[in-house]
Amino acid sequence: ELDSDFAHPSARSPTEGDLMARTAAIARAAIGDVIEHWMPREIVTPPMPIEALPTLDELCRRLRNLGAVGTDASWRYAFSVQLNPEVPSLACDNVLTIFRSFLLLSDWLRAVTAQSMLRRALPFAQPFPRNYVGAVLAAGYRPDWPEFIHDYLTANPTRNRDLDLCPLMAHVDEARVHAYLDDPRIKARPTFHYRLPDSRIEDPAWSVITEWNRWVAVERLAADPEALAERTATFVRYFIDAPESHWVQETSAWLER
């Protein structure tokens, strides 16, 4: 599908006498017909099992052979791969555990994905503020869903985070989420919205499966309570105010042990 809201006129039909609205709709449709030749297109899949992931890499191979390019093809490009891993449980403490694991690995993920300078500069997949990270990693933080949603959207009133929790929170309590952030683009679903990786479809060595496996590191850490507690304590005590690169080095060394 075309990656431009402007190229998709609203589904609402203007009243018969509203000449300005009808003219605007015609203009939007005409502009959409023109810009569809250079606007990027998105590949959107329905929910799929992990076993089907190789079909995405095969699709990328075929598109690459037809001339498709990704972020690295131009300094002007800021294309991404967005994954929506289904949550194993909607229990707030389970979601919080995985979220904490992500916060601990996010600096490392940002480094190993080698996100382009343009995507780093643009607002669409920004890291969480360090003070919010510290609050979530605090040992005494045990929110229920209403408190978690309140704290998250008060500190992050945006979809533009590297791990967007808005769709998941809307699935749990849509009215509460939209009371904080009235954005029609938030679509409720029982998944995380992982927005960090670049699309490098023009590179034969690049793989959607590689990006998925990097996400799996988050789930593995979350599934190891002892390791999660140790990583949390180390980060909070020594690295929360340190340069990002220091924690990246520490995390890389820990993952290689």
PLM regions with names:
Residues 65-74:
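Active-site palm subdomain of RNA-directed nucleic acid polymerases
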Residues 86-88:
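Catalytic palm subdomain of template-directed nucleic-acid polymerases
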Residues 1-41, 47-58, 65, 90, ...:
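C-terminal accessory/tail domains of diverse enzymes
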Residues 75-82:
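Short, conserved phosphate-binding/catalytic loop or strand-edge motifs used
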Residues 82-84, 193:
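Structured core elements
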